[in-house]
Swiss-Prot record:
Modulates transcription in response to changes in cellular NADH/NAD(+) redox state. SUPFAM superfamilies: NAD(P)-binding Rossmann-fold domains (SSF51735), Winged helix' DNA-binding domain (SSF46785). This is Redox-sensing transcriptional repressor Rex. GO terms for molecular function: DNA binding; DNA-binding transcription factor activity. Residues 17-56 bind DNA. Pfam families: CoA_binding (PF02629), Put_DNA-bind_N (PF06971).
Length: 212
């Protein structure tokens, strides 16, 4: 499927927020919710929620709202969360170690199943049940474990080389913590987490406040 045939990326990015809010509602014992109530939880208008969901079908009934459990099931299916998604993590420094120990992935249908680093001092060490593997073996292990997603937590100067190897190995989706834009083929999906860039975007507003 061509990217132009898909819903807007911003819509896809909001779906996990909807799913998380719906899970919280179920935990609170709430079984029906209006688009207005759901929107208030995640700072989105009711109209935006209805428009987002309209890309995938018809959900809910006017005047009644959404069945929380059914809508959650629909969104999880749209996101592919009814599948198990194995993930490779490359770069086991302090950040990588924290990511490897994060328990939240498994509850969302995602599991880190392979750890890689190029530092001989780290190779062979264990984090939980996983042993850190030599990055030189990444192609073989990715093929064996049928991994399609990877997290990059290496310094910026190493990130492009790592991404190139991962793509060659068959990785189709990358989450990068490296502060640089990766060059990848059009059929590979990339997301970035750059805390410095996010903080700098907020300093704009703080600076404006100080000027007035």
């Amino acid at each position: 499927m061509e990217r132009s045939d898909l819903p807007p990326d911003v819509v896809i990015r909001r779906l996990p927020l909807y799913a998380r809010s719906l899970r919280y509602l179920l935990e609170e014992g709430v079984h029906s919710v209006s688009s207005q109530e759901l929107g208030e939880r995640i700072n989105v208008t009711a109209a935006q929620i209805r428009k987002d969901l309209s890309y995938f079908g018809e959900f809910g009934k006017q005047g009644i709202g959404y069945d929380v459990e059914k809508l959650l099931q629909h969104i999880e299916r749209i996101l592919g969360l009814h599948h198990h998604w194995p993930v490779a993590l490359v770069g086991i420094g302090l950040l990588g170690q924290a990511i490897a120990r994060y328990e939240g992935f498994r509850t969302e249908g995602i599991e880190i199943v392979a750890l890689f680093d190029s530092d001989p001092a780290k190779i062979g060490q264990k984090i939980g049940d996983l042993t850190i593997q030599d990055f030189a073996h990444v192609r073989r292990i990715i093929a064996e474990k049928q991994i399609k997603m990877a997290i990059i937590a290496v310094p910026a100067q190493q990130a492009q080389r790592v991404a190139d190897v991962l793509v060659e190995a068959g990785i189709r989706a990358i989450l990068s913590y490296a502060p640089m834009i990766l060059q990848v083929p059009e059929d590979v999906w990339v997301r970035y987490i750059d805390p410095v860039a996010v903080l700098q975007s907020m300093t704009y507003y703080l600076a404006r406040e100080q000027e007035h």
